[in-house]
Curated annotation (Swiss-Prot):
The keyword Cytoplasm applies. The lineage of its organism: Eukaryota, Sar, Alveolata, Apicomplexa, Aconoidasida. Pathway: Aminoacyl-tRNA biosynthesis; selenocysteinyl-tRNA(Sec) biosynthesis; L-seryl-tRNA(Sec) from L-serine and tRNA(Sec): step 1/1. It catalyses: tRNA(Ser) + L-serine + ATP = L-seryl-tRNA(Ser) + AMP + diphosphate + H(+); tRNA(Sec) + L-serine + ATP = L-seryl-tRNA(Sec) + AMP + diphosphate + H(+). Possible candidate for an effective malaria vaccine as determined by epitope response in sera. It is an enzyme of class 6 (ligase). The keyword Cell division does not apply. Its main location: cytoplasm. Catalyzes the attachment of serine to tRNA(Ser). Is also able to aminoacylate tRNA(Sec) with serine, to form the misacylated tRNA L-seryl-tRNA(Sec), which will be further converted into selenocysteinyl-tRNA(Sec). SUPFAM superfamilies: Class II aaRS and biotin synthetases. This is Serine--tRNA ligase, cytoplasmic.
Amino acid sequence: MHLSKIIFLLIILFPYHVNSRKPIKYKNVNNVFIEIYPCKAIKWERKKKKRDLIKNNKLIHNVDVNYINMITNDNHISSEKCRDIKKKRKITSSEYGMSLEFFKKNPKKVVQNLKKRGMEKYLNVIVMLKKLINEKNENEVLRNKLRNRRKLLSDHIKNLIFNSKKYEDIINRDITNDSDHKTNLIHVDEEKKKTEKKNDTQDILKDNQKIRYINKENQATNNNINNQDNSNDVLKKNKIQIEEIKKETNQINKDIDHIEMNIINLKKKIEFNLYKLPNILLNKVPKGKTTEDNKIIKFYKKENIIQLNNEEYDFIEPHEEIIKKYENNFIFSNISNKIGFGYNILVNDIAKLERALIDFMINTHVNKFLYTYVKAPEIVTKSALFNTGQLPKFEEDLFKITDNYKLLNEDAYLIPTSEVSLLNLFKNSQIDYIHLPIKLVSHSSCFRTEKNNTYGKTSKGLLREHIFQKVELINITDKKTSPFYYKKLIKQSTYILKQLNIPYRLVLLNSIETPYSASICYDIEAWLPSQQRYVEVSSCSNCLDFQARRLNLKYKIKDSNNFCHTINGSGLAVGRVLAIILEQYQIKKKHKNEITKIQVPKVLRKYMNKDIIQVEYN
């Protein structure tokens, strides 16, 4: 009976035991459950995470990491455990960009990459690199041989010095003994005389023993004198050998110094030639030769595209004409003749609209997407441009400051994008893994010569300027999570266009169009009504560890140091978005000569304090 009661109690208590082991669930805004398990059941927790990761794969894409961290911190569970969820996703893309190690292991892939990018003219760089690497290796082998020879000579000198000291000690000891023996010889005659005077037989025997001992010592002294001569000869030979070895060692040191200088110069040449090679493309990048080969991923608000063949929109004014119309038209006239082609000025409400756009973009990225706002320098060193991949390929597109001006003893340039300034803030840095990702947003003027694109329809107005405004986004991540944050950055850039209600499309660039430092690149193109085409307003690139290797930017996890991955994108190009707003938000005109009025987008009205901008004619 007692046993049956125990069994009955176990049956009742078993469900409570099972429920106590179930996860605690917290519901987030996206109706996705984040599961946080009791810390005591660590082993069971890991197995459960692996299984739930497959079921709830959307969790990674829908839940913001900072939100996860906030929840986990409230429940006394470290954010690193939530990061483990991200890290366990399968990464199909490459984790490594172009590097010297990659080149040595996969020279054929580097050749294929150049051909895929249409950069066959750089194949001679590969030949040069192989030659330089072989030459460097030969020099290193020769240097190592000389070092080994120097070590052998050093050990030989030590042995010679040790032996010399040994012989010197023997000589010093023999000299001391000789002086004692001479004293003994002086007393021999005295001892003989004493024996003659003594009549005691026992005393005579003792004296004879002393005489025999003294004679024996005298014989030893004569032998020591001969040994001293031999030791002196050995010492002389050792000194000669030591001098010869020192001369040889000095020559070896000079040869090693010369070889090491050659190795340093070869490394610089290898590095310079390696800089000419672009990043390795990911497999998903389509092959192509022209922009027509780009892959269109999706459209947004395609139905809102304004078609000029529609009678309602016959009187849309191009933005390049609008920016020439100022309220204070009696002050400004013939501006283009005074400032040159490729430059624009904005006055009053249009200038305010540009500032409103910048503020809206920065506030959105800082407040909604939790970026850190950084105002970075607009003048950088030459090496900074090498680190991010603008040099050596795009030197003719950069504005170089006069040779008389130096920055950190280097040539100085105006930045083509604030990406250069932001990333170089982390040069030679090691970041703790728990601080990743680092998300930065910056607004700056950007300077480009645009030598090949300064004329024609596609370069009018705000579409292509020598100086333009841009909001830049930078993510520094670890190698496992860069694809995840890359997708997020693209969504963050497109969010701005969605808030402005501007039609756009997302385009995956083909192998020819993909930027030099990128492994993959998506362009965000918005609709420009006056030209009836999409124009690029953002270019989002994942550079993998390509830039981080040049910057020597690493993150530390446990006992290992790995190169970071860098992601960049515009969030957005201010001038082009402004041009689209000036056309997209025009209030319909009944006739061509009617005053142009522009409706301010809803999200910008709080910055402008007005709903409509009126543009007057000159």
